[in-house]
Amino acid sequence: MAPQPLKVGTSKLSKMVKSAPKTAGKSKKRAVEQVSEESDEEFGDQGSGIDMSDDEEEVDGDDEEDEDEAFPEFDSELEDNDQEEASDEEQDEQDTSDESEIVEEDSDSESGYNTSDIERMYASDDDLSSEENKDLPVDEKLSRLIAKNTVKPDDSIGTDDKISRAKEGVGRLVPSKHVKGSFVREYDEYEAGYGSESSTEDNPNTVGNIPMEWYDDLPHIGYDVNGRKIFRPLQGDELDKFLANVEDPSAWTSAEDKLLQQNVQLSDKELDIIRRLERAENPDADFDPYQPTIEWFTGEGKERVMPLSAAPEPKRRFVPSKWEHKKIMKIVKAIREGRIIPNKPSAEKPRFYPIWSDADQHNPHVMYMPAPQLPPPKTAESYNPPEEYLPTEEEKAEWEAMDKEDRKTDFLPEKYDALRKVPGYKNLVQEKFERCLDLYLAPRTRRVKLNIDPDSLIPKLPAPKELKPFPIASTVQYRHPGDTRVRSVSTSPDGQWIASGSEDGVVRVWDLGNGREVWRWDLHAGPIQYVEWSPSREESLLVALVAGKIAVLSPLALVAPHIAAQTLTHSNTAFATSSATTKQGAGNEVKGIESVKWTRPSERERERGVLVYVEVPGTPKQVTWHRKGDYFATVASDAANKSVLIHQLSRHGSQSPFRKTPGTIQRVAFHPSKPHFFAATQRYIRLYDLAAQKLIRTLQSGVKWISSMDVHSGGDNLIIGSYDKKLAWFDMDLSAKPYKTLRYHNRALRSVAYHPTLPLFASASDDGTVHIFHCTVYTDLMQNPLIVPLKILRGHKVIDGIGVLDLRWVPGKPWLVSSGADGEVRLWCS
């Protein structure tokens, strides 16, 4: 802090300089500069100030000499006045310094020096010089002043080797660990008391009021006042805490310190405060709740006679209120309008109290709900009920053996010929008590009666007779020998033949009209899993699935010669080419640990219509044809990533469309008009683009396990059946979730199928029934499909919990073919 500038006329130094000879102008200037240098040295060279050059000093000295020569008459007066005022000013400055010392003692400032300190230092030096030079002549004073201010400068100023400028005084300087050559100051530990400005409960952990969970993953719990880490103390488990409470008597007088994360012992004063708080007493032991009352402002001779306020009365006290005027005018307006009738005569009270009048009934509370009425007595509660209400001995014994909670009634009906013979009811008090409990304990709810027309809740659907034709009765039955279970059935594209696959390993072809078996193939490879006719009308191809093998069949003797020739050409062309081998696709189409083999049957089998064998991994469970009749896809759930295979009959090639199957594939289907492929897993249906080889969309079925699937001829709708008795209709233009979910079967659904040309679809279930529905799909995208239930067909028997297994529509006709576990294939006609 730089020293304050010295004022001429008030500072003793200036007076002393003025008392010196006028020729000492330069010495006067040096004296002032010397005092500034001494003050700078005293304050540790904190303010360097601005140095004056010799030229400037000479100019200043010349100016002062000129001023002295210009006004010589003031010099003698100033000398005399200075001598007279010296004693008075010294006394004043002494008083001022004493007062400043008192103020500084009371001050709480802790930082450096202030202006009063500097003035006190200047005043002390001036006082000493004035006391010594009081009786000296002017020449002696001037010589002493010149000698005092003519001092050689200290060359050591500015050459301090200290790097750290830490404040000296409290604490000790130690070398810094982080900055080389620097020093930091360490302070001794102190114990805060009531006289200290800090808290009396100073904690070694200085992290403050923060959540201690921030340190859960760290080995320390905070920092002390010197910045050192406070490591986490050892923590015992619950057993250690229990043993400490049992063995350590001081454990009950300790509390957990959240900052230090350890138990600290409570002092006697703290325990005394806790005991007082438990007893609802004042925590201060020195507090006297019964100290005598000291009447400071009451009692004789202590009354206050002066008013608290002598302000004059406001104007509003004696001026009429305009707000009251507005209220009165509002009442006057209401009287004029007739809304308020003054002096209205009170109603006359009736002379006699009308006991039958309803005038005294008050309106109940808005939340009031009357108690429910007791049910009226029934015929069984009569003292003379009819004979059919009286229990038999077996019913009495059964009623007495039941628990009270399981009994329908709390009494047994009894018969008396007269009312006077009826004894007292022993459960009367118990029933009234339970009634009272229900009245004040059971919550009540108010049910709002809805007046809804029941017809408005039922959708307006056309009558089934308006939607004919559809199958209504079973006309032909195709019985299999031994009532073997028929797993699959299929109809030829011309609607003349029916193919069925049973568990005896035989594929049979039936005449649709008369029910006669016209052809059969015994594949000797276990149960027939699935059969499917090719949709091409130019050929007559049938695919049958058995364990590990696909058989391509054709009843050549039953079809026209040109159809038979086209069928043989299509299936055997690949055998005639040089590239055809018994292992088609081993290195080209199918890549995996197992290869697909296309083999030619024996000569005898070819005469019977067995055209091609395809050996595949796993057991295929479903086959579906492409609309052109050259490609067909099979599903084998137990074949891992080769569960879905797409085969081409003309080239005898097979390929797997999926490198990794997305779940267990249950059913697959080709899109009727686009190169798209549907794959249904247990819960999802995925639509793939075979040309672009990408996933288009995923449909969420909302069922637990998909069992069957079929695609509408338009391609924008599909239905699925599930083992949890649900049928879901998807409108792919609408949403990825089902448009309708129907649950009308009592057991699992086994098969669902659309009619290829008519607006019909059907579903078969293990409950032995087949449900027929009408479905109209509109070309207008703003109109939802119309679904109308038409008929429930019953005829198949349920064997071992299995009913109807498969169904197919007859092309071009409203007829349906179904197969069941009872060994029958039925034709349902309109």
Curated annotation (Swiss-Prot):
Organism (species): Cryptococcus neoformans var. neoformans serotype D (strain B-3501A)
Placement of WD repeats on the sequence: 481-520, 523-563, 660-698, 701-740, 744-783, 799-830
SMART domains the record matches: BOP1NT, WD40
Annotated keywords: Nucleus, Repeat, Ribosome biogenesis, rRNA processing, WD repeat
Subunit structure: Component of the NOP7 complex, composed of ERB1, NOP7 and YTM1. The complex is held together by ERB1, which interacts with NOP7 via its N-terminal domain and with YTM1 via a high-affinity interaction between the seven-bladed beta-propeller domains of the 2 proteins. The NOP7 complex associates with the 66S pre-ribosome.
Disordered: region residues: 1-141
Protein name: Ribosome biogenesis protein ERB1
One Pfam match: BOP1NT
Compartment(s): Nucleus, Nucleolus; Nucleus, Nucleoplasm
Basic and acidic residues bias (residue ranges): 131-141
A GO CC annotation given for this chain: preribosome, large subunit precursor
Protein purpose: Component of the NOP7 complex, which is required for maturation of the 25S and 5.8S ribosomal RNAs and formation of the 60S ribosome.
GO molecular function, one term: ribonucleoprotein complex binding
Principal subcellular localisation of the protein: nucleus
